[in-house]
From Swiss-Prot:
Gene3D superfamilies: 2.30.30.100
Gene Ontology terms: biological process: regulation of DNA-templated transcription; regulation of RNA stability; regulation of translation, ncRNA-mediated
Lineage, top ranks: Bacteria, Pseudomonadati, Pseudomonadota, Gammaproteobacteria, Vibrionales
Region (Disordered): 66-88
Species of origin: Vibrio atlanticus (strain LGP32)
Gene name per UniProt: hfq
Known function: RNA chaperone that binds small regulatory RNA (sRNAs) and mRNAs to facilitate mRNA translational regulation in response to envelope stress, environmental stress and changes in metabolite concentrations. Also binds with high specificity to tRNAs.
Record text on subunit structure and interactions: Homohexamer.
Disulphide connectivity of cysteines: none
Highest taxon listed in the record's lineage: Bacteria
Keywords: RNA-binding, Stress response
Protein name (Swiss-Prot/TrEMBL): RNA-binding protein Hfq
Single GO MF descriptor: RNA binding
Biased composition (Basic and acidic residues): 71-88
Amino acid sequence: MAKGQSLQDPFLNALRRERIPVSIYLVNGIKLQGQIESFDQFVILLKNTVNQMVYKHAISTVVPARAVSHHSGEQQRAPSDRPEKTED
């Protein structure tokens, strides 16, 4: 998985799973609103009164209507949680 998607996928998945309304701004300035129904590597399926398939390369910004809790999949440990080196 590409590094960019390790942040993107959990964020979009949290928006989808929690059914958080989003505003999606396209690179041409158009604003779309709805809920993320599904997504893959190239598109987002946005549901409102109709379903719209939006190509990710056309998206500038995704703005959730409220805060979203998400994890990047990579857990970061505090320095105290790291195993200490032992010398044999």
